[in-house]
């Protein structure tokens, strides 16, 4: 059986993923990015540390490791454990092929909290000579350009690296699928409209559904034909108004 995830040791699993993503890097555009979601597992009373093992192995293989993002789950799966905390997060790693890459931070800006907005309104502003000009409310035109983390027009801020996303079961699959809301920022920030999103582990097609919803194209690779057969239904579940698929190909080997 060639399916990844059935290896005898963590090192074998890590090595297989490195090989897969080496091929991904080969065909990726020079300004492309890789967004990798990984959970962890236990064995013999020890946490394997799979996400970071994979991240460092990919970095050693030539990828630029740009950021770790925490997927915080408000509704994690219960665990019958009494000697540690219940696991309620996974990792998403942002990696790139080159030092400079496509990343649309404007597309995924998030709302500021009310306390942030009130604090912003009370802050003193400085003109280009370093002299105070009153609060933002009193001197809106003189707002310092350096305060780029807060946009005065709509009070948006750069997206933070902890994403709280509720897990959502998908009845069409008997295996775990990540929620569309989790990967939406990855696609919006990492791929322009009309671009192509590649998922080497296509599964039920969640990535394709989100990509098509946001006017991107998608290529899925899936070893298991049973999973591949779910793609049409999953796309309709995510994007009910789709008339025709921009899905380029589903590779079954």
What are these regions (language model features)?
Residues 1-238, 247:
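Core catalytic lobe of class I
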Residues 242-253:
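Acidic, low-complexity intrinsically disordered tails
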């Amino acid at each position: 059986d060639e399916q990844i995830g059935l290896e005898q040791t963590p090192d074998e699993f890590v090595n297989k993923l490195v090989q897969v993503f080496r091929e991904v890097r080969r065909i990726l555009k020079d300004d492309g990015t890789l967004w990798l979601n990984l959970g962890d597992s236990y064995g013999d009373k020890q946490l394997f540390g799979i996400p970071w093992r994979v991240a460092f192995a990919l970095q050693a293989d030539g990828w630029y490791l740009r950021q770790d993002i925490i997927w915080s789950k408000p509704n994690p799966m219960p665990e019958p454990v009494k000697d540690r905390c219940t696991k309620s997060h996974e990792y998403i790693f942002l990696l790139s092929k080159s030092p400079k890459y496509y990343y649309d931070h404007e597309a995924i800006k998030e709302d500021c909290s009310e306390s942030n907005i009130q604090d912003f309104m009370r802050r003193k502003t400085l003109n280009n000579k370093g002299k105070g000009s009153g609060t933002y409310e009193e001197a809106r035109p003189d707002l310092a350009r350096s305060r780029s983390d807060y946009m005065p027009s709509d009070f948006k801020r750069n997206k933070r690296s902890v994403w709280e996303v509720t897990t959502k079961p998908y009845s069409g699959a008997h295996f775990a699928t990540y929620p569309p809301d989790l990967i939406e920022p990855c696609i919006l920030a990492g791929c322009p409209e009309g671009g192509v999103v590649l998922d080497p582990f296509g599964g039920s097609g969640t990535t394709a559904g989100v990509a098509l919803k946001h006017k991107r194209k998608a290529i899925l690779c899936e070893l298991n034909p049973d999973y591949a057969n779910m793609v049409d239904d999953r796309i309709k579940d995510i994007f009910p108004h789709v008339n025709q698929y921009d899905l380029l190909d589903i590779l079954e080997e």
